[in-house]
Amino acid sequence: KLSDFDFLKGLENHIPTEYYNRAEAKGYQKYEVVSMVKDLLNYVEDRRIDYFVFTHSPGYKGYYHSLYDKYFHSKVIDKALKSSEYTSSDWDSYIFRIINLTNKNSDLDALPDLRKIRKLIFSNVKSLNSTEEAFNIALDVFHILLENFPDGVEKEDEETGEVSVQKGDGDSDGNGESVDGDGSEDGGSDGGKPELTDNQKKQLENAINKQKKFMDGDISKKALSKKDKASMDAVES
């Protein structure tokens, strides 16, 4: 029932060639495809295992809630989800919105097909019995993302004449701010949505990195501070 680490080690070979080819046309290299699918699989696999643990060991529910409150329900994450941050049709925007789908502030209209992605993941969680089955759902999500990523743009090297495909307009600069010329960096002029200060944007970037490390197993799910333990006990009672 728990993660199949042998399957995860061979992830690169499990991804069908067509996905590499489609992603290349969008400007993504092979190593980027592996990384993206891995992140999506981590999220789906976490949801699968959470459901398994909640079902078979309900006493752990408060423990898990305490951990997720710490990494997935911080104030800066809540505010960012309500803002216009991470609303470009690029990888950074989609993964931020996807890994925070369970947050009550999640805006399913922030990106194309986000509502469809949520339904795809959560309508299947209860029936997933293995890492491979979770992988197939992650691939289905990646298929949707590829349909929404902008087409890549061919660029020719002036010296060598070599042609490469780079990511098209609408990609993120790494901080979730759109670079597609929409004239709005942080949503301050977009329907009264909350703005993030420069300091909050740095906090947000740090919070997202911690979320990804958490899903990747780099942050121990066993290490709880006394404060976290108290929060867990409060939820359990």
Walk through the language-model features, giving the residues of each:
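Short, functionally important secondary-structure microenvironments
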Residues: 1-237
